[in-house]
Amino acid sequence: MRKVAIYGKGGIGKSTTTQNTVAGLAEMGKKVMVIGCDPKADSTRLLLGGLQQKTVLDTLREEGEEVELEDIIKEGYRNTRCTESGGPEPGVGCAGRGIITSVNLLEQLGAFDDEWNLDYVFYDVLGDVVCGGFAMPIRDGKAEEIYIVCSGEMMAMYAANNICKGILKYADAGGVRLGGLICNSRKVDNEREMIEELARRIGTQMIHFVPRDNFVQRAEINRKTVIDYDPTHGQADEYRALAQKINDNKMFVIPKPLEIEELESLLIEFGIAN
């Protein structure tokens, strides 16, 4: 079972990219589980046909300790197993702590046991690595390979670099490695070349360049992944390609984060700062 975590700047399209990629893996016949690690609880909606899933923490709050696996895991597109950790009530408590509680409960209830024949577990993690709770999949060895969703925008690259610092910090203890950058295009000038160069300097690869296409939003409005909504569309092939590249990936590295000056010089070199 491969344990994958998807990180990236808030709003970069992690949940969309994760769900569309998982749909590609499921179409290949892979058995996948998706764990949403975001209080917004939107990491599995497209796989479940738009259903807002009841989160692990909400279920715990309402039902106490008497929780069964079927209470917190729902079957989605092509038998993907979907769960959302959820978070505390707004303004109260720590969302990162909620992720730790949820993942530990899933383990206790046997969500990762051999009987499920899982090929992949995907953790879709909120925003940058800003606190220990959100770093938990990296820190505690829950995830073994990380993919960072980014774009050619400065803050997305800055966040990607920060996440690499988090991976570096826990690489020895947790055994986690970076599998590559996924460029979720924002149509920035020289975007593909810039992210390829960023990946090279960090010591990794740009595993796939996902072109920007409004069809992704159209599929979302219809509460589906692109592959589910229109399997013949060109954008569906992009996500299939990304799924195949992740499935075939053999390049797992401890990243070499850049100094802020190096990052800024990269932006200047490729024209974004002009």
Swiss-Prot record:
Any GO BP: nitrogen fixation
Domain of life: Bacteria
Keywords: 4Fe-4S, ADP-ribosylation, ATP-binding, Iron, Iron-sulfur, Metal-binding, Nitrogen fixation, Nucleotide-binding, Oxidoreductase
Binding site for [4Fe-4S] cluster: C94, C131
Co-factor remark: Binds 1 [4Fe-4S] cluster per dimer.
Cofactor(s) recorded in Swiss-Prot or TrEMBL: [4Fe-4S] cluster
PROSITE patterns on file: NIFH_FRXC_1, NIFH_FRXC_2, NIFH_FRXC_3
Residues where ADP-ribosylarginine is found: R97
Binding site for ATP: G8, K9, G10, G11, I12, G13, K14, S15
GO molecular function, one term: ATP binding
Disulfide bonds: none
Post-translational modification: The reversible ADP-ribosylation of Arg-97 inactivates the nitrogenase reductase and regulates nitrogenase activity.
Gene3D superfamilies documented for this protein: P-loop containing nucleotide triphosphate hydrolases
NCBIfam families, per database record: nifH
Protein role: The key enzymatic reactions in nitrogen fixation are catalyzed by the nitrogenase complex, which has 2 components: the iron protein and the molybdenum-iron protein.
Assembly notes: Homodimer.
Full protein name: Nitrogenase iron protein
Organism, scientific name: Chlorobium chlorochromatii (strain CaD3)
